[in-house]
Amino acid sequence: MIATKRITLYEKAVLVTEEYLGPAGERFLRRQINTHLNIEPEQLSKKNLPKLINWSSIAFALLTNNPKVIEAFTNDLRSLILNGK
């Protein structure tokens, strides 16, 4: 029997963020979590997601002026609340 590793919510959020920011995605997300949630990234839970999504979307908007990309990024993060993407 092959053991499968269960992916954490933080790891799922990193995957989403890396789709938009490449390898810098994890560092970006870690900073958002540490700065705005005052928790370690590994402690991320669904109850923290709305605040994280809000701050991450604001910070992401400072990196691009493309509203469609900002909306897609935000919606992809929101999907973690509903289905864990």
What name fits each language-model region?
Residues 1-85:
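Long, compositionally biased intrinsically disordered regulatory segments in eukaryotic proteins
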